[in-house]
Amino acid sequence: MSLNFAAMARQSERQASTVMVPKGEEQPESPKIHTLGSNELRKPAKRISKVNEQVRELAREMLRSMYAAHGIGLAAPQVGVHQQLLVIDLDPEEAANPPLVLINPEIVATSGALDTYEEGCLSIPGVYLNVVRPSQVDVKYRDELGRPQRRKADGLMARCILHEMDHLNGVLFVDRVSDELSLSGELQRLGFDRNDVKPVA
């Protein structure tokens, strides 16, 4: 997910994680983020059977890519790794605020009103369009140490979790955009192919 939510991000709750990489610095070589049109983005992700140092290093590499691209969320399929792993940091400019790592996340329930907000994505840079999503989500997952966790989130955190979890199923936020005119116009403006969008119900 891309940084078009700065005001909302400042109101976000603190996140807990021990996987840290430097923020606000030039990032070392990091995995390439695939963009709309890449088949890598459409492949479903597989569950991670064992949480180990290799998984933690992947999370660090994803964070480096995310920070370098000025994003607030990234899913493993976006860097061509088809495993169920997400990293989120709603306050990427605050060094003391650790990122959130979600391994094998599962939605327990969604609730609250259906809200419409503008979203962006590091895999579709420059495109920002309105998407309707539930305002609250209850998600269970394992953290970077393999411990089971459960989290209830609302606002930007809920939206970011839902956005990134879509990537694990090969779904992009543009697949959920209902304003066809705006969608086609934005994609054309930035050189993306409208035919690469796969609408979901």
Curated annotation (Swiss-Prot):
Biological process according to GO: co-translational protein modification; translation
Ranges of compositional bias, category Basic and acidic residues: 23-32
EC number: 3.5.1.88
Binding site for Fe cation: C121, H163, H167
GO molecular function: metal ion binding; peptide deformylase activity
Details of cofactor binding: Binds 1 Fe(2+) ion.
Main enzyme class: hydrolase
Family: Belongs to the polypeptide deformylase family.
Role, per record: Removes the formyl group from the N-terminal Met of newly synthesized proteins. Requires at least a dipeptide for an efficient rate of reaction. N-terminal L-methionine is a prerequisite for activity but the enzyme has broad specificity at other positions.
Protein name, entry field: Peptide deformylase
Gene from which the chain derives: def
